[in-house]
Design a protein with these regions (language model features):
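Protein kinase glycine-rich loop
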Residues: 54-60, 65
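AlphaC helix of the eukaryotic protein kinase fold
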Residues: 83-105
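Activation-segment/catalytic-loop signature of the eukaryotic protein kinase fold
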Residues: 117
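Conserved short submotifs of the Hanks-type protein kinase catalytic core
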Residues: 121-135, 139
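Activation segment signature within eukaryotic-like protein kinase domains
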Residues: 154-155
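Protein kinase catalytic-loop region centered on the HRD/HxD motif
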Residues: 160-170
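C-terminal lobe helix-coil module of Hanks-type protein kinase domains
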Residues: 212-318
């Protein structure tokens, strides 16, 4: 620790620009100040057992997620802290426990891996695999829409993850771009199982809980029983948004968006963006059918359709340069 006058200072590394800067040493743990170099927020680190929390990588209603260093295993992890004022709410507390149990029971490359769940001095925390390269939501915000091949790859991987979820008799119930994160290898990771529940409970109609109305299945809106087909619909809406740059249904009010999911015909993706291939467009139209019975009958069937669309897209992409080259040769011989 260094001192300037009577004020203690602490040297930390800015997570945004990598510069080592001094911040007030008496700053409360997890509090932030602006980096003197780049202006981005720098957080006062906090020690939680063997985990050094270094910076915020996500914020939610239940609490924040921090990038942390495990000083025992010497690896970077993510630590989710539940807001202390929520611990007394049995419903929210159960949601936090539900997320931990659900993720811990699943072992899939594209589902965030849980390392431990514990309590320290009244603070509940969840330690998990680090995926700090942004969400699908942030990618859409940055690029407006993503390349078709990338969207198909994400769709195939998350559909496979959801198939694993279903094989463990679980429904995720909150599929949206913000709940698909990316790690350093650009591998998509499904997160946030706070609303997950057992498939056996699918016939129990309960109050609808949405974080956002843009990807919710019609049967959920109508208070009809949910099934894995509801998760499938939400995945379709998520891919639609990433592919076209537009949510499937948009309107001035939440109520109108909700009604559109039930009553308004979906505009096929290739009518929104003409260069989207027909097989990809057809797959998303089917996965977002109003009637669950008209969607794909299984995740395997959906994955096969996305693989077929991907293969045809690659054929077209490879054929296009050859066509141009052939035209160029023809033009040369006509000279």
């Amino acid at each position: 620790m260094s001192q300037s006058g009577d004020k203690p200072l602490k040297m930390v590394t800015c997570g945004s620009c990598g510069t080592k800067v001094f911040i007030p040493g008496d700053l409360a743990p997890l509090s932030t100040v602006a980096c003197s170099k780049c202006g981005q927020s720098i957080m006062m680190p906090m020690r939680l057992r063997q985990f050094d929390l270094r910076g915020v990588i996500g914020k939610g209603g239940m609490g924040n997620v921090y990038r942390a260093f495990d000083t025992v295993l010497e690896r970077w992890v993510a630590v989710k802290l539940m807001r202390k004022e929520l611990v007394d709410d049995p419903r929210l507390l159960e949601s936090f426990y539900r997320e931990a149990r659900a993720c811990a029971s699943l072992n899939h490359t594209n589902i965030i891996h849980i390392y431990t769940f514990d309590e320290f001095e009244g603070q509940l925390y969840l330690v998990m695999e680090l995926a700090d390269q942004g969400s699908l939501d942030s990618k859409i915000e940055k690029y407006h829409r993503l390349p078709e091949l990338e969207v198909l790859d994400v769709g195939i991987k998350i559909a496979s993850a959801l198939d694993m979820v279903l094989k463990h008799s679980l429904l995720h119930r909150d599929i949206k771009p913000a709940n698909i994160l990316f790690n350093a290898d650009n591998e998509p990771k499904l997160v946030d199982f706070g609303l997950a529940r057992k498939v056996e409970a699918e016939h129990e109609v309960e109050d609808v809980a949405w974080g956002t109305p843009y990807y919710v299945a019609p049967e959920k809106i109508k208070r009809e029983p949910e099934s894995f087909l509801s998760d499938m619909y939400s995945l379709g809406g998520t891919l639609y948004h990433a592919l076209t740059g537009h949510v499937p249904f948009d309107a001035p009010t939440v109520e109108e968006v909700v009604v559109a999911h039930v009553q308004t015909a979906l505009t096929p993706p290739n009518l929104v963006v003409p260069e989207i291939t027909q097989p990809t467009s057809d797959a998303l139209v089917r996965v977002m059918a109003k009637n669950p019975a008209e969607r794909f009958l299984s995740y395997d069937e959906l994955i096969m359709a996305l693989h077929a669309a991907r293969a045809q897209l690659l054929v077209q992409q490879y054929a296009l340069p050859e066509t141009r080259q052939a035209k160029a040769k023809t033009a040369w011989w006509r000279l």
